[in-house]
Regions:
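Catalytic Tyr-X3-Lys loop
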Residues: 1-10, 24, 28, 52
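C-terminal substrate-recognition "lid" of short-chain dehydrogenase/reductases
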Residues: 10-12, 16, 24, 111-142
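Active-site helix of classical SDR
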Residues: 12, 48, 56
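Residue(s) in the substrate-gating loop at a strand-loop-helix junction
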Residues: 32
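Active-site loop-to-helix junction immediately N-terminal to the catalytic Tyr of the SDR YXXXK motif
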Residues: 38-46, 58
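Short, small/polar-rich loop/turn modules that mediate ligand/substrate recognition or access, typified
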Residues: 64, 69, 135-137
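Short, flexible catalytic-loop segment of classical short-chain dehydrogenase/reductase
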Residues: 70, 75-85, 89
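Catalytic Tyr-x(3-8)-Lys segment
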Residues: 88-118
């Protein structure tokens, strides 16, 4: 909770000190699909990521007069080193191999694959770009349609 929610809050709070003097700005927080849908067995993680989304929406309402947008990205399972740690944890708890645990994550994505870091980065670049002025107070899912 302290890293996911408090860390995001403290970082955003400091960045807001500089926003009013600029002509426009973007605040983008990283949440998770778990913050949108909840994740079985990960109550605190899901709650902290849901808190990030709530904070972003409240900041959007509070600072609507600033030329700043507030959004969150909510990736599903992204093919990174974190997946290896997750598959190890799942395999130990479920008494299955790490390959089977990874396959479970892949199966959650209707595209039949993990999300790539480049896909997340592309979404973040669009949200932070000059053509996204009306995209504000949103939690963008980057999950391949993961339920």
């Amino acid at each position: 909770m302290a890293i996911n929610l408090d860390g995001a809050y403290l970082t955003i709070r400091e960045s807001l000190r500089h926003m009013p003097v600029q002509e426009w700005g973007r605040v983008l927080a990283v949440s998770s699909i778990a913050g949108v849908r909840g994740l079985k067995g990960a109550h605190a993680y899901s709650a902290s990521k849901h808190g990030v989304i709530g904070m972003i929406r409240a900041l959007c309402a509070d600072h609507a007069k600033l030329p700043v947008t507030f959004n969150a990205i909510c990736p599903g399972y992204v093919d990174t080193d974190i997946i290896d740690r997750n598959t190890q944890s799942i395999s130990e708890r479920a008494h299955i191999s790490q390959e089977e645990a990874r396959a479970l994550m892949v199966d959650l994505n209707p595209h039949g694959r993990l999300i790539t870091a480049d896909e997340v980065a592309s979404a973040a670049l669009w949200i932070c770009g000059p053509g996204s002025d009306s995209f504000d107070g949103q939690a963008m899912e980057i999950s391949g349609g993961q339920p």
